[in-house]
Amino acid sequence: MRFILKSIRRLIEAALIAAAVALGGILATHFWMRLKFHALLQGGAPQSPANVEDRDMTSLVERLRQVPFKGKSANIPGMAKGAIMNSFLLALNAARATSGVMYPYPEEFEHVVIESFDGTPLAAAVGIHKDGIPRPAIVISHGFMGSKNDHYIIDTALTAYAEWGFNVLGIDLRNFGRSQSLAHGPTTAGWRESEDLLAAAKYMSERPEVTSVGITGFSMGAGSTMLAAAKAGEFPYLTGGAIAWNGYADAGRMISHISTRPPLTDPFFPVYLGFRLMHKIRREDMKGYIDDPELRPYLDAGFGTSDFTTYVEKISAPHYGVSTEEFYRNASPANFMADVEVPLLVVHAEDDPICPASEMDFVIEAAADNPNVHVMMMPAGNHCMFRYLDKGWYDTVMRDFFTYWATW
């Protein structure tokens, strides 16, 4: 018994030390981001883009492929930094009370609520330069269970605003971040979120300080971005190109993948446990606003007995009045790549454990006859870790792409 108690005490001590290290890292990073932001803040305009008549997606992508990439899958410090900066926030984001509390935006950003096309209110942080010079804008979207306050999102937003000179909007997609406190419409794996992004693009395009609007998203935000690009003909507010980082082709296949327990040795296993934990936290939170007795068994289910496929079947698809099959069809970007009429760059990593690289085979096939869509596969990058493995490469690709497609 003494040995057991001693072991438990050691585990608790180790957990407290790990939590202290993570919290210290987050606070230090927050301070460093603010310091860098104010050091870079200039107010100058982005570099002028190419002549509109000379712009060509194929030649641009070939140029971006030549940007030196130093990222390696064995970059343990970069991977550890990304995990520390973002994993703790994902757990906080799972509940309304704690979502978006870390990494607040600086005072140069205005907090607004915009309305998606189905009436869903969405929280956003908007950075508009005050020098009176109209300039292009970028809408930046987080991934599943994330928020606009995730480290990689806010760091990208602050860099785009202060260093590249863009206007910026960081969005909390429906049911995530502060948006989950505004309405309880469930997430749709990118289907309705694509319209959230286009509503954000509409909001920015109506600002007199904005000349064109690009969209970029990560993971589920990437799927949302790909779907938004396909809908840009119907919602003509995406005028400055789009980049999707670590997206997917088939939403049903992806939700099944993250809901299926992998072997202990699989790199995805710790992420799977994290998803399970976040789903459990989210279900506990949902008890505060769902009182349907038929859903109680789902909400009360244990850590390992309910998953995201159940969420789609019992919560999301019924809420939007569609079958599960129609839900997945609407949320699968590969079904709509032939419809994309705006420049869309899809960046993916060969070693992505969450959205497997094989997903891109389906995207490439679906977009084979569409010159507006290009897929750029990188040898490493894990899942949305490009910024931590090679920030110089990541910044260059992002800045050069959106500068190229910006209009004035």
Features from the language model and the residues they span:
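Acidic catalytic loop of the alpha/beta-hydrolase fold
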Residues: 350-355, 384
